[in-house]
């Protein structure tokens, strides 16, 4: 008996020690969380006009609940602060956040040098400091970041040379140092995409370029006494003209040679036509798979491995030879306009859209008969599958997770709309296209299959791609899409998160009539929001947050697209900034009150309230419903 007690006591002691070790892993000997200290130091050196860092509290013991901070296994793994109007400098204490995998600070006004201490972040995979006002040289310590895939330092005021140490990083996919004041030669980096445009004094890789090719200052003989009168003056003028012409010719010649070199080099960013079927050719971190590999991984595309069906194709679960689980999307239409080159160009665009809340492309397969995309497998499926299709017995998403999903999705869409080049319109934002990673972080899928948007143009199509109930009225009536089309779809997604229902399935029960959006508007006007709530939540929700999220959803789904907020504004409203003012303005008549214009060719005999269901019934365009049958 004593022996049993001793064993039980010892096991209990070991469990206690293990728990204590885990809970105090980020604590200093004085009991202070060093990650909290580092983040607060970062906050203190930044000017934060919109108070986005307000809840970064030095007295907190857990930074994982802070805005713009994400954690993995209890450690800070991501710092995402894009487009927050931040200024000031970046604290060297950021180097103490040694579990960081992603730092995104683009589109702010941060000044000063890039801290050398960033070189300590050995787990860092993505560093984006673009579109700020950083000065000084690029730290050589960045070469110590062995896991770095993406480095964006473009559009700053950096000087000096690009450090040779970057050549030591073998896994680089993208390096962008364009539009700075850099000079000298470039290191031979492994990145498939290396952007240097906008640095007038950069002279190319050491292996192929001669940095001494800058012309020496032209020296003319000093003027002496005028012995030949006008003839001598004419001679001087001719000499000056010839010298000027020679200098101009040299500049044009040098510029032409540089542009030719850039053109030749940029062609190598993608595949050479003669190599387009070479299975060994890859694009940065992307792998080019053979059809045989993917057929084997999916057991000959067995129907038992189908994860979902959509308008673009079928998604299969796959097991690669190394045991890795992947999602294999076999596209329906192999005859993409532009053929192989156009497909590869779109693959490149997808691969360069990198954000924690976007589904990362792992690889692809391309041949005359097949177009296949390979993505990481998401073990927690889609939001749609988690809301209703709990076949595997998983619990329903609780309220806090649903709000986290809303914010994460908004961040992903902000990146697509405002930080990608070219911008990308998703055109089918819905719960089935929002996937969940192992931490239940929202990951926007299928974005790369939408049409790309040039900065100057909106996309017009004669066939509307999307899911009924999610398609914006102007898209239904005219075929014209814009970023505001996605804002509308996001508003419907918020309603799906609240109700636990798919917009496409809404109206099948006896007490539901019309479409989801019209029903929500009616209940909101009647003050009966509680009827909206998903019964699986068992009344465990925040009533104030419910009201706020419904308001955001209604702002997003206004019929007039010009009245809808931008996704960056939506994100701020979800985080508690500016919603009250925007909602009040709408209610006071400065927002949308009048009925939207009717679709072309329709005449209204009398003013009346327009409902979303009217647009669905009246649309003469082809609607290709995209609906997945299961988690992806």
UniProtKB/Swiss-Prot annotation:
GO cellular component: plasma membrane
A GO BP annotation: anther development
Top-level EC class: transferase
Residues at the active site: 428
Annotated region (Interaction with geminivirus NSP protein), positions in chain: 415-495
Phosphothreonine carried by residues: 298, 324, 461-462, 467, 478, 557
Xref: InterPro entries: Kinase-like_dom_sf (IPR011009), Leu-rich_rpt (IPR001611), LRR_dom_sf (IPR032675), LRR_N_plant-typ (IPR013210), LRR_Rcpt-Like_S/T_Kinase (IPR051824), Prot_kinase_dom (IPR000719), Protein_kinase_ATP_BS (IPR017441), Ser-Thr/Tyr_kinase_cat_dom (IPR001245)
Pfam family, one: LRR_8
Cytoplasmic topological domain: 260-632
Topological domains annotated Extracellular: 26-238
EC numbers: 2.7.11.1
LRR repeats, residue ranges: 97-121, 122-145, 147-168, 169-193
Secretion signal, residue range per the UniProt entry: 1-25
Main location: membrane
Gene3D superfamilies: Phosphorylase Kinase, domain 1, Ribonuclease Inhibitor, Transferase(Phosphotransferase) domain 1
Domain annotation Protein kinase: ranges: 301-584
Similarity comment: family membership: Belongs to the protein kinase superfamily. Ser/Thr protein kinase family.
Role description: Involved in defense response to geminivirus infection.
SUBUNIT field: Oligomer. Interacts with geminivirus nuclear shuttle protein (NSP).
The name this protein goes by in its record: Protein NSP-INTERACTING KINASE 3
Organism the protein comes from: Arabidopsis thaliana
């Amino acid at each position: 008996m004593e022996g049993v007690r001793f064993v039980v006591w010892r096991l209990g002691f070991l469990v206690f020690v293990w728990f204590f070790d885990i809970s105090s892993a980020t604590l200093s000997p004085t009991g202070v969380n060093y990650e909290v200290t580092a983040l607060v130091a970062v906050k203190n050196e930044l000017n934060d006009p919109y108070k986005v860092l307000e809840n970064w509290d030095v007295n907190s013991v857990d930074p994982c609940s802070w805005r713009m901070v994400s954690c993995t296994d209890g450690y800070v793994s991501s710092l995402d602060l894009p487009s927050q109007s931040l200024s000031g400098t970046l604290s060297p204490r950021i180097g103490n956040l040694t579990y960081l995998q992603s730092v995104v600070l683009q589109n702010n006004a941060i000044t000063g040098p890039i801290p050398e201490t960033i070189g300590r972040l050995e787990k860092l995979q993505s560093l984006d400091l673009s579109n700020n006002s950083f000065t000084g040289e690029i730290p050589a310590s960045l070469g110590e970041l062995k896991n770095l895939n993406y480095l964006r330092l473009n559009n700053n005021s950096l000087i000096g040379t690009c450090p040779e140490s970057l050549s030591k990083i073998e896994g680089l996919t993208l390096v962008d140092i364009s539009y700075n004041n850099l000079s000298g030669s470039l290191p031979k980096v492994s990145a498939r995409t290396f952007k240097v445009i906008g640095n007038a004094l950069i002279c190319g890789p050491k292996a192929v370029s001669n940095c001494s090719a800058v012309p020496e200052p032209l020296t003319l003989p000093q003027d002496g006494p005028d012995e030949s009168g006008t003839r001598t003056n004419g001679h001087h003028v001719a000499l000056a003209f010839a010298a000027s012409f020679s200098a101009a010719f040299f500049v044009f010649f040098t510029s032409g040679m540089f542009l030719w070199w850039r053109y030749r080099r940029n062609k190598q960013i993608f595949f050479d036509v003669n190599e387009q079927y070479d299975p060994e050719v890859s694009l940065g971190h992307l792998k080019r798979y053979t059809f045989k590999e993917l057929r084997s991984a999916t057991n000959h595309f067995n129907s038992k491995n189908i994860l979902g069906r959509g308008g673009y194709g079928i998604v299969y679960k796959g097991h690669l030879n190394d045991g890795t689980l992947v999602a294999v999307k076999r596209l329906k239409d192999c005859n993409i306009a532009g053929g192989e080159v156009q497909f590869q160009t779109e693959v490149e665009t997808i691969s360069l859209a990198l954000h924690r809340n976007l589904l990362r492309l792992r690889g692809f397969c391309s041949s005359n008969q097949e177009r296949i995309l390979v993505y990481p497998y998401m073990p927690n499926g889609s939001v749609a599958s988690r809301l209703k299709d709990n076949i595997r017995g998983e619990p329903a998403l609780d309220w806090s997770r649903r709000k986290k999903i809303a914010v994460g999705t908004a961040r992903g869409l902000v990146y697509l709309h405002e930080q990608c080049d070219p911008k990308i319109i998703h055109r089918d934002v819905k719960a089935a296209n929002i996937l969940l990673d192992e931490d239940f972080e929202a990951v926007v899928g299928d974005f790369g299959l939408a049409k790309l948007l040039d900065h100057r143009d909106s996309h017009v199509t004669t066939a509307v791609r999307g899911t009924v109930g999610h398609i914006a009225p102007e898209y239904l009536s005219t075929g014209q899409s814009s970023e505001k089309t996605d804002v509308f779809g996001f508003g419907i997604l918020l309603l799906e998160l609240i109700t636990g229902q798919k917009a496409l399935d809404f109206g099948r029960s006896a007490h539901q009539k019309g479409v989801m959006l019209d029903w929500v508007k009616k209940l909101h006007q009647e003050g009966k929001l509680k009827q909206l709530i998903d019964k699986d939540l068992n009344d465990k929700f925040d009533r104030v947050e419910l009201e706020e999220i419904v308001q955001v959803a209604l702002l997003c789904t206004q019929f007039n697209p010009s009245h809808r907020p931008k996704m960056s504004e939506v994100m701020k409203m979800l985080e508690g900034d500016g919603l009250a003012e925007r909602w009040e303005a709408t209610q006071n008549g400065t927002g949308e009150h009048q009925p939207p214009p009717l679709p072309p060719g329709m005449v209204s005999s009398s003013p009346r309230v327009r409902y979303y269901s009217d647009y669905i019934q009246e649309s003469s365009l082809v609607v290709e419903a995209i609906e997945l049958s299961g988690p992806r």
